């Protein structure tokens, strides 16, 4: 679910109106390592791929059954509907293009395998997350119109994360693929502007001549593209949502602070106004002694 960072008592109130849903898939050490530790499948990379293919085959048959039912019912036949399966309904949503795949993948060979599988079953991959070998996969990512969502300089914490370079994000961008900055670290994710600056600097040191205006797209327009929302957010243009951050200095400076945040044209944060700053809806009934 894609959320907007707005005040609400419920997740439903934060949902981005009309945004497509997303589904995470994973390949590599995480599924095989976790499931293997429980003596469950998939415990190898091969079984992981086999399990995915089996699931897509099952979803394809499930979709065919419902398509046949709808066609028969529309023709006036008195026919009972197939049984519902919420797991397969989710996969059918992917096959019909309503749910976007975000694929956890590190290595180029597994990205290639996932692309092959998407072609076999006729769905699209929105993005590969982590993609520490994105610089190797960049041409195939550009051809398939798949974003790579990457760290600036985080690697080496497990075997499949070893073969990264600091120029990873810059090289993916240089090859005209969709490069996106990210982090699942609780500190780095608060300073993605600085992560962009690090990745841009690495690219410039090798002579790629990346401008700040291009680099900032890694956190804005390209990120919106990975969510299927680049027609509404990610850049300042007529007809798009008025989502704007005003910085105290250059956005990529380590000294820069977000001064104001506007979402949908409304001021949602103002560093100089305590009444327009984040508050929690937890413990509202508890009186704190003055």
Where do the PLM segments sit?
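Polyanionic/metal-chelating signatures
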Residues: 1-127, 257, 263, 288-289
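Amphipathic coiled-coil/heptad-repeat helices and related helical stalk/stem segments
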Residues: 87, 110, 134, 164-165, ...
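His/Asp/Glu-enriched, well-ordered alpha-helical/loop segment
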Residues: 100, 139-247, 267
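Short hydrophobic/aromatic-enriched beta-strand-loop microsegments
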Residues: 123-130, 147-152
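C-terminal cap of metal-dependent C-N hydrolases
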Residues: 225, 237-282
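A mature extracytoplasmic/lumenal domain signature
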Residues: 5-7, 107, 132, 152, ...
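Active-site environment of divalent metal-dependent phosphoester hydrolases
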Residues: 108-112, 131-138, 188-190
């Amino acid at each position: 679910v894609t959320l907007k960072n707005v005040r609400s008592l419920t997740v439903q109130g934060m949902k981005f109106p009309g945004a497509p849903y997303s589904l995470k898939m994973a390949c590599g050490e995480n599924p095989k390592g976790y499931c293997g530790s429980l003596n469950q499948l998939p415990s190898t990379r091969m079984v992981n791929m086999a399990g995915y293919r089996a699931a897509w085959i099952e979803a394809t048959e499930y979709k065919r059954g419902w398509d046949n039912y709808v066609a028969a019912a529309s023709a006036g036949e008195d026919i009972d509907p197939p049984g519902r399966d919420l797991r397969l309904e989710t996969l059918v949503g992917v096959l019909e293009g309503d749910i976007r795949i975000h694929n956890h993948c590190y290595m180029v060979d597994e990205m290639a395998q996932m692309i092959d599988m998407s072609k076999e079953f006729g769905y699209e991959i929105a993005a590969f997350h982590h993609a520490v070998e994105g610089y190797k996969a960049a041409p195939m990512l550009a051809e398939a119109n798949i974003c790579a969502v990457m760290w600036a300089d985080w690697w080496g914490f497990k075997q499949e994360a070893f073969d990264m370079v600091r120029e990873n994000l810059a090289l993916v961008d240089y090859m005209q693929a969709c490069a996106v900055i990210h982090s699942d670290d609780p500190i780095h994710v608060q300073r993605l502007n600085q992560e962009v600056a690090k990745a841009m600097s690495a690219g410039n040191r090798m002579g790629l001549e990346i401008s700040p205006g291009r680099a900032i797209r890694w956190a804005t327009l390209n990120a919106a593209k990975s969510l299927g929302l680049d027609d509404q957010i990610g850049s300042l243009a007529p007809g798009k949502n008025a989502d704007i951050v005003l910085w105290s200095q250059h956005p990529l400076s380590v000294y820069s602070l977000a001064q104001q945040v506007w979402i949908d044209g409304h001021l949602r944060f103002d560093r100089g106004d305590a009444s327009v700053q984040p508050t929690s809806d937890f413990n509202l009934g508890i009186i704190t002694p003055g």
